[in-house]
Amino acid sequence: KIIQNLQLYNLALSDTEGSTELNLPIRSKSLFKDNIEELFKLGSATIHTANIFENFKSITVQKKKLDNLNLRENIGFIKIDVEGHEQNVIDGGLQTIKKNMPVMLIEIEERHSKKPIIQTINNIKELGYDAYFLDKDDLVNINQNNNFKLERNFVFIKKN
């Protein structure tokens, strides 16, 4: 353990259990700020089958549901950054999420999930959350009147 209340698990989270292929994009050894394609590949490993790269290698990893990890009580925060597999992770952790109602920071992008961002946002809101994005130093509540579609990182906080 690195920190007293932090546990690391060497596995992928989803809505099913077993083994799966983790796709790792292969990139060139050099990385320049104007090489957008190479920058995109950084941190883009995924088990989401709709998000496949032209040049990648796969490794087999264990896949579990968040609900089956037997985590401690009082989970206060969950970070999800899974390149298109967000809804699957949430579906596999519904009991944990509903029981603890943690603050969640979730990266959601249409280019990864291949579905509208608002669909995932609305699914999470139905669990009893308000949805926000960060604009400079302010949390802005997502509604039909603001331009949240340019955002990627969303904060979900239990409704009052």
What are the functions of these language-model segments?
Residues K1-N160:
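Phosphate/nucleotide-binding beta-alpha loop and adjacent structural elements of enzyme active sites
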